[in-house]
């Protein structure tokens, strides 16, 4: 992929509802952030480098959505990779081609315990029941209604597939972040006057 030539990439991966977007916000903020500084040190990332973020799915639509291309101007690009989304084989193939053309590629895998993930999926579905993600995450969540044991096994197998994929990529750095390491501030509730 020619847009990635000479770029430093950080792939932030995890299942739906694991906290990837929150993690990316923390890693791309310009405010003081001890967690970000720790991750940057561990991965050898220059904190002064201009950065942006984009989802792996958006990279497949650069021709139809030219606005996405401007995110690729920066030298450091964080890529949001949902390991439970649809069209995994296409996205994995794209990731491999990107890895061959970029200057460096590092991976941050967000490890979320099954019970925490299950609670977040339930909350997501309760908030907006008509917008269930039609992906592997939804299948696992539905399976958990009948057999929590098999759902947990299926959930863990997604991480194993991801680990197998990234073993075949020549990485410049890899980090596993446990969900409890990320500081989460509760969102302020909107008040209606």
Which stretches of residues belong to each language-model region?
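Phosphate-binding P-loop
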Residues: 2-6
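Walker A (P-loop) ATP-phosphate-binding motif of ABC ATPase nucleotide-binding domains
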Residues: 9
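Hydrophobic anchor at the beta1->P-loop junction of P-loop NTPases
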Residues: 12
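The conserved Walker
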Residues: 15-16
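Walker A/P-loop
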Residues: 21
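Conserved substrate/cofactor phosphate-moiety recognition/catalytic segment
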Residues: 24-83
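Conserved phosphate-donor/acceptor-positioning beta-strand/loop module used by diverse small-molecule
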Residues: 102-121
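Small-molecule kinase domains that catalyze NTP-dependent phosphoryl transfer to phosphate-bearing small molecules
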Residues: 127-193
């Amino acid at each position: 992929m020619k847009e990635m030539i000479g770029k430093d990439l950080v792939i932030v991966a995890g299942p739906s509802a694991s906290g990837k977007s929150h993690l990316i916000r923390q890693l791309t903020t310009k405010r003081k952030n001890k967690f970000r500084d720790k991750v940057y040190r561990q991965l050898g990332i220059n904190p002064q480098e201009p950065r942006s973020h984009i989802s792996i799915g958006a990279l497949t639509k650069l021709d139809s959505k030219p606005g996405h291309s401007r995110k690729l101007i920066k030298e450091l690009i964080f890529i949001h990779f949902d390991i439970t989304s649809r069209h995994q084989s296409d996205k994995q193939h794209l990731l491999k081609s990107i890895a061959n053309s970029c200057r460096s590629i590092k991976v941050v895998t967000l490890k979320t315990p099954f019970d925490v993930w299950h609670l977040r999926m339930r909350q997501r579905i309760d908030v907006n029941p008509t917008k269930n993600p039609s992906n592997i995450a939804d299948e696992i969540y539905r399976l958990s209604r009948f057999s929590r044991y098999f759902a947990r096994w299926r959930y863990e197998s997604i991480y194993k597939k991801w680990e197998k994929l990234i073993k075949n990529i020549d990485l410049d750095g890899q980090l596993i972040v446990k969900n409890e390491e990320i500081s989460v501030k509760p969102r302020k509730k909107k008040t209606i006057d």
